[in-house]
Amino acid sequence: YIFHVSGELNGYSHMIAWAIWCLALFLNLYYGYFASLLKGVGAVAESNKVMVIARTAQLIILVAMLLLKTGLIGVSVSYITYGVVLRLLYKYYFYRYKSIGKNLNETQYKPVKDDILKLFKTIWHNAWKEGAVSFANYFCNQMGTIVSSLYLSLEETGVYSMGVQLATAVVTFAYAMYTSYQPSLQSAISNREETRVKKDFAYTVFVYIIITIIGTAAVVVIGRPVIRLIKPEMNIGVGIMLGVSFYQFILKFRNCYTSYLSNSNRIIYFRAFMIFAIVCVGLEFLLCGVFNMGMWGLVIAQVVSQMIYNVWHWPLVVHRELNMNLYELLKLGFLETRNKLIKRHV
């Protein structure tokens, strides 16, 4: 595939960039368990701190490499930098959190085969469903780039990919608050603390929406001109940027509600995710390959495939369970945000 889309390029820099990218992707996936370990022991703040530091390091290296005109190799190097920094800091914080490293070294327990098999059977019931959900999410996000490389010019593919990266960075940052509240939500749900569940959930969803709006506005007003200054040929239109941002927003918005369901071990949404991931890719091929709609074909396909079902159905399920509609949830989220801000300044 890489040879196919880069057939007109000279030299081997794109293949070197691809090799570095594959190595970086492997490292990020392989050491991803450290994030779960940190959250599992309660070090949520440390986990989020590591993510911010690693992303900052990636952006700094990316800008520096682009200024040095290293092209795709620079992008790949910045990505592997993110993975290395992430792994080192995850390990650092985990082994120093409440003397975990010291306690592990003093532990003499060696797991036996039967214990491992029993644990695997217990986890597998929901683990394969979560895996299917992760695959569906990856399929939705990454297939757009592949389809664009088949039907769009190299310049358009680059513009689309950059727009996706910027939008993803914004919503990932906005979603961090929700992620940090996951242990609190899980505890409140398991203890049947309905009031606390409503307040925490409303607060995190409201904050996610507000930060996404502010972040997207900042990217459109400030980010685009800065990128154009660094890379003049990278002209991301306002419409495309807003379209890609809206798609990334509804993905995480949907995830707010499905994560709420998974907190009580209900992965009831995995089939819908898989079905509409296939619908998404089918629409992308149809709109780009048959109707030649370019980047807008990708955006429309992605948005429509989620709006058909996932974006409205799972919020409706959760709202019914919480006995509140979206307006009431946002109102409660606003009040909780205001109260927390007041407490911090008192």
Indicate where each model-derived feature is located.
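Interfacial segments at transmembrane-helix termini and the short loops linking adjacent helices
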Residues: 1-20, 154, 194-195, 220-249
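Helix-terminus/linker motif at the lipid-water interface of multi-pass membrane proteins
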Residues: 3-6, 64-69, 131, 138-169, ...
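Membrane-interface helix-loop junctions in multi-pass transport and translocation proteins
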Residues: 10, 45, 56-88, 223, ...
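Membrane-interface junctions at transmembrane-helix termini in multi-pass inner-membrane proteins
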Residues: 25-51, 242-275
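Helix-loop junctions and terminal segments of transmembrane helices
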Residues: 40, 98-102, 163, 167-192, ...
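Interhelical loop/hinge segments that connect adjacent transmembrane helices in multipass membrane
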Residues: 72-78, 88-141, 192-196, 320-345
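Interfacial/gating helices of multi-pass transporter permease domains
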Residues: 72-77, 118-126, 130, 147-168, ...
